[in-house]
Amino acid sequence: MTKSPIGGNRSGRKLGQKVKKGKLKASSRRWIERHINDPYVQRAQLEGYRARAAFKLLEIDEKHKILAGAKRIIDLGAAPGSWSQIAAKVTNSTDADPRVAAIDFLEMDPIPGVRFLQMDFLDPEAPENLKQAIGGAPDIVLSDMAAPTTGHRQTDHIRTMHLCEVAAHFAVEVLAEGGHFLAKTFQGGTERDLLNMLKQNFRQVVHVKPASSRAESVEMFLLAKGFKGRHALESDEPAEGAAEE
């Protein structure tokens, strides 16, 4: 996730610190008011999750059953850590027996059972470091990575789709057979080459927009279920696209 470190923001102001309205632009004031009144933000605070994004993963899992039985999980773009919290609980991960590896270029407060790497996933050393941290083939690769937005929709889409593609190829490289891949993408179309690659390597590929994803947001999630293994038949015919929900 492309978010500020926990406990503060890029301005250095502590979370929860009151700000004089006169110093805020109208758009910033509206964002703060929406955030404070967001029922998912309130639920996250009540249930101990670090971000409302936890409910996106939980809602997707409620329908698609991707978390049950997972023994190892890799979380890409993990900060501030709500998906890693869920992953650690699902895998019964502990500091003595860590089964979750997470990565983000932003800081992230420690989570019991999660090995966190503060580095850019696009760093050439990142994939190998994650493999070593997880200690075996993961059953799930999660990616909530998104490039910082520029305000230009096409540019933002291209940059985030690049992260999605890199994450997808990493998933195919490391997943255990039968594993799943879930990644953030933006509305505007998923590149055909990426969809074809996923269709060749997974048994089902769908686009998902959970209810907890804000209606005005362009984000969606690409879910690839049932990894066929690295010996998938080359003769498998790729589908034309992913189903949408």
UniProtKB/Swiss-Prot annotation:
The keyword S-adenosyl-L-methionine belongs to this UniProt entry's keyword annotation: yes
A cellular component term, taken from the record's GO annotations: cytoplasm
UniProt cross-references to PANTHER family, sorted A to Z: RIBOSOMAL RNA METHYLTRANSFERASE, RRNA METHYLTRANSFERASE 2, MITOCHONDRIAL
GO molecular function: rRNA (uridine-2'-O-)-methyltransferase activity
Basic residues bias: start-end ranges: 11-25
EC identifiers of the protein: 2.1.1.166
Family as reported in the entry's similarity comment: Belongs to the class I-like SAM-binding methyltransferase superfamily. RNA methyltransferase RlmE family.
Subcellular location: Cytoplasm
Catalytic activity from the UniProt record: uridine(2552) in 23S rRNA + S-adenosyl-L-methionine = 2'-O-methyluridine(2552) in 23S rRNA + S-adenosyl-L-homocysteine + H(+)
HAMAP family: RNA_methyltr_E
Location of region: Disordered: 1-25
Positions contributing to S-adenosyl-L-methionine binding: 81, 83, 104, 120, 144
Active-site positions on this chain: 184 (proton acceptor)
InterPro entries: RNA_methyltr_RlmE, RNA_MeTrfase_FtsJ_dom, rRNA-MeTfrase_E, SAM-dependent_MTases_sf
Gene that this polypeptide is encoded by: rlmE
Transmembrane feature ranges: none
Keyword vocabulary terms for this entry: Cytoplasm, Methyltransferase, rRNA processing, S-adenosyl-L-methionine, Transferase
Biological role: Specifically methylates the uridine in position 2552 of 23S rRNA at the 2'-O position of the ribose in the fully assembled 50S ribosomal subunit.
Protein name: Ribosomal RNA large subunit methyltransferase E
